[in-house]
Amino acid sequence: DDLASNQLPAFVHEFHLRHPGVRLEIRVEQQLALLEWYDERVIDMAILPLEQPLILSSDIELWQDELIWVKSRERNYALTEPVPLVTFSPKCTYRDAAIECLEVHDIDYYISMESPSLAGVRGIVSSGMGVTLINRGLMTSDQCEWPEAKKFGKARDVKFVVRATSMIPQKLRNLVISELESLLPGKAR
């Protein structure tokens, strides 16, 4: 979903212009669903953000981003009141990271909204309905970092990786990686 919201349309457009003979079948889903599909060989390649413990030595890192706590610029949330958490659905590792962080720091919270999509999470946070944990690069202009989250220390980093089966020829894998990196100036390895 991270890629689909920002880089995917440009990637698909450029890829098809440069490689009209290559047919792509693209599915967009949250990390844990993609990993399940990959393990079941429903898909041969996954491009997804993962935290270090989930990264395999065979994964190819595209770029790294930090997770940050984000809120609407219009609203403030004190840690003395139950924190409204806007989160992704259970197939997203960011949800687990957010809940774990709040529970480790003994912060009272409730899930004010759950969405399977980045657009849903960002929209609800922008409306002032709560805070969320997302990649720094996905924060919108009407959002800002949640200052109270400094109490939690530095949030985790995520790495956007390519995971591909041996069914994907090395030449095609390299082609996809090269095309993705060309769209990410300053973020690529």
Regions found by a protein language model. Name each.
Residues Q7, K151-R189:
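A late-sequence structural motif
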Residues P84-H105, L172:
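Secondary-structure junction motif
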Residues D1-L54:
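Central regulatory/effector-binding core of bacterial HTH transcription factors
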Residues R23-E29, D108-S117:
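Short beta-strand-to-loop elements that line the ligand-binding cleft
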Residues Y38-D39, A98, G123-G128:
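Hydrophobic residues within well-ordered alpha-helices
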Residues L54-P90:
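Flexible hinge/capping segments at coil-to-helix
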Residues E29, I43, I47-P49, E114-P116, ...:
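Short beta-strand and adjacent tight-turn residues that come in two discontinuous sequence segments
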Residues I55-I60, D65, S126-I168:
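Beta-alpha-beta core module
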